[in-house]
Amino acid sequence: MTIIQAPEAPRFDLPGLVFTGLASPSRGSTDLCTWRLEIEPGFASPEAHTLDRDEIFVVVAGSIRLGPDEAPVGAGGAAVVPAGTPIRVSSAGDGRAEVVVAISAGFSATMEDGTEVGTPPWAV
């Protein structure tokens, strides 16, 4: 069993977002990846991306808008995004949103313009 304590988890700061890697192949999980995503108020993804696996978003605090239709998801809610669905995420409230994300290990991401970006560093 692998325990990942918050202070030891790798953190990736991007404009308007913080990804904190939890479970992944390099952190003891062969089949699944999870990370915590913090979204600053007013943030909106500049472009959509798609993934080759289903992705699950569980909103722990705040609220977000997600997907091609910018569907709202509030604290305590979850969204299951099927593989191949264009994903955009944005803050939907006045405060910071916190989300736990889960997906199969080894997934690959493709940006809206067709650029393949593979697996991001918080999920390896």
Each predicted region: which residue ranges?
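Short acidic-glycine-tyrosine-enriched beta hairpin
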Residues: 69-84
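Asparagine-centered strand-capping/turn motif at beta-strand->loop junctions
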Residues: 89-92
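A short hydrophobic beta-strand segment most commonly corresponding to one strand
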Residues: 34-36, 56, 80, 94-111
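A short, N-terminal "cap"/entry segment at the start of jelly-roll beta-barrel domains
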Residues: 1-31, 115-124
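Conserved short histidine dyad/triad with adjacent acidic residue
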Residues: 20, 33-51
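Short, charged/polar surface micro-motifs in flexible loops or helix N-caps
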Residues: 27-31, 39-44, 63, 105-108
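Glycine-centered loop/turn positions within well-structured domains
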Residues: 54, 71, 87
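Glycine- and acidic-residue-biased ligand/ion/polar-headgroup-sensing regions
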Residues: 52-64
